[in-house]
Amino acid sequence: MSEAIWVKLVGTLPSLLWVVFATVVYLSLRGTIVQSLVPRISALRALGVEVEMAGQLIDQAAEVSETAVTPADRQGVLGRLEHAADILSGGKILWVDDHPENNVALIRLFRSVDMRVDTVLSTSEARLALGHGSYDIILSDIERHGDPQAGISMLRELERMVIALPVLVHAANFNPELGIDRRIFAATNKPVEIVHYVIDLMERARFGSPQV
């Protein structure tokens, strides 16, 4: 073999060694790299929808409720949804509202993370649902069928039934200056805040903390 060929081989040896070294390192660390990506991949798959679709549902819910969603609000709630996907999966919500069409976007959003959402139109229907199934959270409006205190009356009914589930109020005409009933975990007219509160309550339920 000529001297020129030997010189050329010697010159390419460092590059070949780096390729071999990189290959060995990749094969050695491949399992660790994949495992580090699993939580994020699982969270994205558990969402059931693309993150952008979840963002669109948030925007639709805000539009129906006539509340503004800032870019920071949007980014924050989508980030929580992604990381709380496993906690939300399997959660059960009973939603009491005589206008469920106003909640379609949020219902779709919660169902997209594998939550069960049952909708009823009245307190009497809520009693039947609670008697035949178990739930983690009750979501309710305040005014129903012309009764401005229907939601509050339902709370007293829950007490008589000895049902201690946390109650979230989502009402377009909610006025925090009027105060919040002791049985209400939180109340708001902002869909983004409802999502945060649902995550908060499901975290408590999963980790065994007191709910109310």
Task: Locate each region found by the language model.
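Membrane-aqueous junction of the first/signal-anchor transmembrane helix
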Residues: 1-63
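Non-catalytic signal-transmission and effector/linker regions of two-component phosphorelay proteins
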Residues: 63-92, 191-212
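Conserved acidic segment of CheY-like receiver
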Residues: 90-100, 106
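Charged docking surfaces used in two-component/phosphorelay signaling
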Residues: 104-112
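Acidic, metal-coordinating helix/loop segments flanking the phosphotransfer/catalytic sites
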Residues: 119-137, 145
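Conserved phosphotransfer cores of two-component systems
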Residues: 131-133, 157-164
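Conserved phosphotransfer microenvironments
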Residues: 138-160
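Hydrophobic/aromatic residues positioned on beta-strands within the core alpha/beta folds
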Residues: 168-172
